[in-house]
């Protein structure tokens, strides 16, 4: 069974002034299988952010359905949405979203604190994750004391510590330099190889070339998709670049 199923999702906004209707998503349908690493790409205004907000249960579609591990997100009570999100989804953001008044360790623990876990349970979960991500020596430091790449590794640890069914990454390399980007993409690959499902929205061809599948959104619809198959990162990079050129020049779906 798919870990994520998106079926006919449409999102229509009404503008504040004038009451005009804006269709951000027309009819988006796709599925993500357990253990997949999927990238979503598209030009600004294509609907990527709207789609991610709906998948994260931060917004609701005008029509259509989203299922996470068979659970219809529209059937979750408002009072349970935050708990469902915390227990089932891990988030990695462009700007890290770490609290400067908390140590790196406490930032990572935060979802488990909210879930009422004991310190012993939190420590047991953190140790192997911190070792894998190479942040054990940083745990007592504060976000303002570490580099951007180290902050993002802390954010990845926070996403992993709840054992999420799906990690949603929103432009995770956007605020990183080239070296930190390479390191994060290497870590994402390692995490994915352990069976973790990842869905990443990105403008970066380099980041997308590490995924096993790339979906392209244009004018609120899935326009095209590429599968890695046996291709190298370099070969997929070129195919992604060619597809983005086609998108920009108004090419036809293929």
Give names to the regions the model predicted.
Residues 56:
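Helix-to-loop junction immediately C-terminal to a conserved catalytic motif
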Residues 64-72:
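Conserved ABC transporter NBD signature motif
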Residues 102-110:
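Short coil-to-helix segment of the ABC ATPase nucleotide-binding domain corresponding to the Q-loop/switch region
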Residues 142-146, 150-152:
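Conserved ABC ATPase signature
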Residues 161-165:
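A short, proline-enriched helix->beta-strand linker immediately N-terminal to the Walker B motif
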Residues 167-170:
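Catalytic Walker B motif of ABC-type/P-loop ATPase nucleotide-binding domains
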Residues 221-245:
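Conserved beta-strand-loop-alpha-helix hinge in the C-terminal portion
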